[in-house]
């Protein structure tokens, strides 16, 4: 029994190491986009801008609320026009390290949200999208109201100011309705 556990551990370590080397796959993105749009809540994707964003503007998009899947970030990461075109989505290191889940995130084009990757991307002038509420906000998701968790989340604002980026909040309407949820155990 112990040897079986060692093989399983080695397998998962190998998966984690291999998936860390993956880059975005456009074919995978097209396929999953079609699947996501077939689900309820994301059949129509529309952007409504409260103010003009010029193509040369450096943008940091903060998406909220973080639903169960955070599908809105995934859809807009590969939007084919506007300021979100070529936006890099940032996800937690934990998500990107999980076996198989991290594989799908990396194929989609997600990168780790840590100081090094943010400084590198912002230093290049790349538009980025992130979910300031993170896992905590995802656990608050219910289908009948929008809930946001932003307490003590100010590091991204520091980087935006340091690299002269505009911060644009993005309300993902119906993100919380994408999956059925329940309020309490």
Residue locations for each model-derived region?
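Cytochrome P450 catalytic-domain "roof"
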Residues: 45-52
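A cross-family acyltransferase "interaction/gating" segment
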Residues: 95, 134, 140-185
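Membrane-lumen (extracellular) interface motif
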Residues: 1-9
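Phosphate-binding P-loop/Walker A region and its immediate neighborhood
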Residues: 131
